[in-house]
Amino acid sequence: MPKGRRGSQSPTMSQRPAPPLYFPSLYDRGISSSPLSDFNIWKKLFVPLKAGGAPAGGAPAAGGRSLPQGPSAPAPPPPPGLGPPSERPCPPPWPSGLASIPYEPLRFFYSPPSGPEAAASPLAPGPMTSRLASASHPEELCELEIRIKELELLTITGDGFDSQRYKFLKALKDEKLQGLKTRQPGKKSASLS
């Protein structure tokens, strides 16, 4: 008897609930009253694209099909912030009386531009050339340190160690550091005078 109960319960136990539908308008074509009703949600979502210059409802879409649209339906207004400046319903993002602040997130990482702006500053010609000349030294030092660390890792892993190359790279690094240190005081005295 217990076997019969298990057998009768197994069909109900094997029925699992349907997985959730994340985009219901793509799956409910059989349930909807008309095939166009599930397309309406997508028209609402892509209003900004139509307002931004994408083809209107009468023009062919990317797939070559035209979007179904009623002949008497006026185009919905663009969302706030889109459309011609004269028709924008929201105010400008920054009050006109205040100074404009340009958005330059990477300004910290680049040097001042050369040209009329750089020519206007009195320190532009001399320091720019010396700054560019010294900019390669940290890169070279970094490269040397990477190679030295690679040799040290080879020693640790036991894959082989070239002592001559290690000594050469160390001496080269020390030489570059000395050259950089001797230039630094010269730069400071030149900039003060």
UniProtKB/Swiss-Prot annotation:
Pfam families in the cross-refs: DUF5529 (PF17669)
Region annotation (Disordered) ranges: 1-21, 53-96, 114-136
Biased composition (Pro residues): 71-95
Compositionally biased intervals (Low complexity): 53-70, 116-127
PANTHER family the UniProt entry points to: SIMILAR TO RIKEN CDNA A930018P22
The protein's name: Uncharacterized protein C11orf91 homolog
Organism name: Bos taurus (Bovine)
